[in-house]
Amino acid sequence: MVPIRRTDLTSLSEGRALQPVSMPPAAVPLTVRTVLALLVLTALAVLVHGYHLGADDAAIYVPAIKNVADPSLYPFGSEFFMSHAHLSYFANIVGDSARLTRLPIDFVIFAWHAVSIFLLLLASWRLAALCFLRRSAQWGGVVLLAALLSVPVAGTALAIMDPYLTARSLSTPATMFAIACYLSNRRAQALAWLLFTALVHPHMSVFAAAFLVCLELARRPARRQENLLAFGMAAGLPFLFPLHAAQGAARDALYSRTFFFVYQWAWYEWVGVFAPLAILWWFSSRDPRGTTRVFRTLAGAAIPFGLFFTAAAMVVGMPVWLENYTRLQPMRSLHLVYVIFFVLLGGLIQEYVLKKGIARWLGLFLPLSAGMWFLQQASFPSSMHVEWPGSHPDNTWNSAFLWIRGHTPKDAVFALDPNYMLSPGEDMHGFRAVAERSVLADSVKDSGAVSLFPQLAEDWRSQTQAENGWQNFQLADFEKLATEFPITWVLTRRPGPGGLTCPYENRDLAVCRLPSSAELDR
């Protein structure tokens, strides 16, 4: 290990302004005090950013987790979430932990969400310790990241950390650990974290590996072998997907994900692409006070990383015959750029602005946290801010879902409005995730599965089209639907249609049982 220069040690001992050093300081030990501080930050992050079981993207991930914990669930339609789950071990890790501990599955999912936030903050603290000399600056980076977990990442439809559990919840801290280990010259540990990332989220692991390559190229000139390897990987890309436009229902599903196509992004979303990269370039070209060389290396590596994938997104988003490649979502690379950016920015804000003033810390982080709290309130206006496991929901949709979970058979198959997730008051909660019952495909989240797995397209279209005109369905329409699909129950607007037995109603919804074939024959 190359020692820190004597002049830097002299500056430290005399209390003079810290200057950048050529090597990072020795690894900061993880003390009980640090762990407690990270636990407090984790708790505050949950309270600020909220938690929502099975909402949005978790509507795909949570059913797979629950299916691992209880294989008797979801006898119909599981392909719409298992297509994702079969590609990783994320559902197995979480689902098996519930099965082995025998704890309530909703509590286990919430616990993993909290653990994932703790791990992200711990990994960010490890990385900040390599970039900043002062402990206060290191914590500045971690606290800023914790305060901004809900920040949207440009036009990618991602946040730094979602207020619900997904595979990204674990892949993000794993990626940060991999980067920190790599920059600490612990290559074996970096590889182990990279492999773990691939196991829980293969897609995001590609970006993690690419960033490590950018770090290596930033630290030393590219070797010919590396160039040949990169060329070989790029040469294989044309064989991933067919080189022609998507067809039929698969194309409809693909174009339902407008964020795949960067030319449809708004101007402010493009600002979200280039502003962080420009600031990171400025970071890499300066010698900020109290930073190490790792700071500049990290900032410098993020620039070609972000620009490369932005260029890739622009290429695949232009010609129609390349539109299948938009499924690779190269702009998701910005997710990692944002995490690194806020860690570095937070450290510099502390170093230059906040310093040791408690009032300054509160003056910055209280308004930021309040802004994130209001953002989440606006995103989930009809739900509790933190949907604690076992609590009684305010949301009438979730109330109906939970009644269904507790009062209908596990093999029940439901039908409901294919656009139910967009209904006022629903707040994007997934039926399968909360009710734990099978259901016909929807037009909101299941279309996302189809956009990535076009082999599901025809089943998806047949199920969603069969429910066209749902708002006007009467008994005869439900009976006709039951002849096409094995549905036994429906969730519809109150009051339930005449002729159906509806054992549950709330102020908005009714849960109704369809008559069996024997009852219809009478």
PLM feature segments, named:
Residues 379-522:
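Extracytoplasmic
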